[in-house]
Curated annotation (Swiss-Prot):
Record region (Disordered): 173-220
Gene3D superfamilies: Ribosome maturation factor RimP, C-terminal domain (2.30.30.180), RimP-like superfamily, N-terminal (3.30.300.70)
Family of the protein in this entry: Belongs to the RimP family.
Keyword Transport in record: no
Subcellular location: Cytoplasm
Organism: Chelativorans sp. (strain BNC1)
Leader peptide range in chain numbering: none
Gene that encodes it: rimP
Major localisation: cytoplasm
The name this protein goes by in its record: Ribosome maturation factor RimP
Role noted for this protein: Required for maturation of 30S ribosomal subunits.
Gene Ontology CC entries for this record: cytosol
Lineage of source species: Bacteria, Pseudomonadati, Pseudomonadota, Alphaproteobacteria, Hyphomicrobiales
Length: 220
């Protein structure tokens, strides 16, 4: 089943998303979020990732080179802007059903477009997620409120993880395992006399840590 985004943009950001999504798909990436910010001049942030959730600095640069010409042709924004390509980071936005399911047990902030249980903002541990409903265990329960909040997914306008020690530990563990797998694959290639790049040669050092990555360029 296709893992489409549940949370989407409106206005100019939606126009940008419609332009860049086919470009990202062709390169093997997927769109996380588009956001326009007026702070320090107009900045267009395009957040993307590979299907496995990774996004390196080189990936950001590749995406920037690919989407810039498409944006120049379509010109969805009237004024000059700075283009910023970034990875989701550890405290990432949650925009797909798979994002919410992968975040089970972690603390998150959620905003809704309509009132749910008398409020539009929630903060708590994600304890369940079906195809229709997100269940959060509130970290602070007001008098008269139930500990668990049942939030319809189609009512969510924004959601992101909250940076915690547990989230950092999980991210470091995942990063360590990814490094181990890359090193293992590289050694297999060397035993066969061919490296990952298709050429024979000595083992190359590990690349820089694949954390939140950014690449910025000027747009018009």
């Amino acid at each position: 089943m296709q893992d489409d985004r549940i949370i989407r943009e409106t206005g100019a950001a939606a126009r940008v998303a419609a332009i860049v999504m086919p470009v990202l798909d062709a390169l093997g990436y997927r769109l996380v979020r588009v956001r326009l910010s007026a702070q320090d001049g107009l900045t267009l942030q395009i957040m993307a990732e590979r299907p496995d959730g990774t996004m390196t600095v080189d990936d950001c640069e590749e995406v920037s080179r690919a989407v810039s010409p498409a944006l120049d042709v379509e010109d969805p924004i009237d004024s000059a802007y700075q283009l910023e390509i970034s990875s989701p980071g550890i405290d990432r936005p949650l925009v797909r059903l798979s994002d919410f399911q992968a975040a089970l047990g972690h603390l998150a902030k959620v905003e809704t477009s309509v009132m749910v249980d008398g409020r539009k903002r929630f903060r708590g541990q994600i304890v369940g997620c079906t195809g229709e409903t997100l269940t959060i265990e509130r970290d602070k329960v007001a008098e008269g409120e139930a500990p668990l909040a049942e939030i319809p997914l189609d009512a969510i306008s924004d959601a992101k993880l909250v940076l915690t020690d547990a989230l950092i530990r999980e991210a470091l563990k995942k990063d360590k395992e990814e490094r181990r797998q890359r090193k293992k694959a590289r050694r297999r290639g060397e035993k066969g006399g061919v490296g990952d790049d298709g050429t024979a040669g000595e083992e190359q050092p590990d690349s820089a840590r694949e954390g939140p990555a950014r690449s910025a360029s000027e747009g018009e």
